[in-house]
Amino acid sequence: MGGPLMWALLLPLLLHQAGSQTSSCSVLSGYMDWTKEYFDTCLNFSGKILTQLPQNQSLRARSVQLLDLSANGLQRLPWSFFRDLEQLQLLIVTNNSLDFVDRALXXXGCGLELLADCSCALLDWHTDRQDNCSGPELPRCLDVPTGAWHNLSVFLDVSCPSGLTKIAIGALAASGSLLLVLAIAGPVLAWRFCRHRMDQNLSKTWASQDGSRSGSGRQPRYSSQGRRPKSPANTPPRSSTPDYENVFVGPPAARHQWDELRSPPSEGGDFYMTYDSLQHESQPVYCNLQSLSQVPLDDEEYVVPGR
């Protein structure tokens, strides 16, 4: 009990000392040259509007113990930039909109104290620090609106219960916006699609009706089988030679041929059949009448093209 209580009492003093050290570090002027080697134990790069740290090299300052990167608009803290800072004890990155803190910083050493704004971006770093460090230290974070320091663990438990970072929160917000757009636009798109399908079906129906009307104008083709007297019961069986009759495919203009050969059959017993060819040419069609011995022999057939 004594250790944590003493640490809680000493932490404000340490923060005050850190602030005193920071104030004693003058801000470096001029252009930032990351290839330059620094031999100072305290480096103050605050307010330099760096926005981004080098991704492929470390700061050349092996003796630095306090590094102030506050108020720069930084969003990422890559491990590669701090890799060679073996003496670093205090890293100040307040007043930056961080959305990524490399969790490898927690493995750099339990003696490194990180001062940052309260943010869910600290979750991975804090988790690894708790796993690797068992000291009585209580990491703190700065509440920017009030300027007060809070327990980082409590803040993460309350504000980031599911481990949401800014990137995850942004992704969820974007997904919600997309679902909202789909919910609004979905019924409209479905209505337009159904209307388009109905218009297509209606057009096909009209086209089929027009085709049937135009097809009805084609000339029918006729076949006739003359009326013959019924043979008596004792009539000998018919010859095995099949009977054929010409069927003329063409316009019914040759009606007078019926008048010369035979009188037209009565309408009550007529049957009609049409033979439809793709070339619409008149040509004789032969059919075997032997299979029609069971039906009256005076039938005529008429078929309308297209039916």
Swiss-Prot record:
Protein's cellular compartments: Membrane; Cytoplasm
Superkingdom of origin organism: Eukaryota
Transmembrane segments: 169-189
Residue windows of the LRR repeats: 63-86, 87-110
Pfam families linked: LRR_8
Keywords from the UniProt entry: Cytoplasm, Glycoprotein, Leucine-rich repeat, Membrane, Phosphoprotein, Repeat, Signal, Transmembrane, Transmembrane helix
Record-linked InterPro entries: Leu-rich_rpt, LRR_dom_sf, LRRC25
Subunit description: Interacts with RIGI. Interacts with SQSTM1. Interacts with p65/RELA; this interaction promotes the degradation of RELA through autophagy.
Name this protein carries in UniProt: Leucine-rich repeat-containing protein 25
Lineage: Eukaryota, Metazoa, Chordata, Craniata, Vertebrata
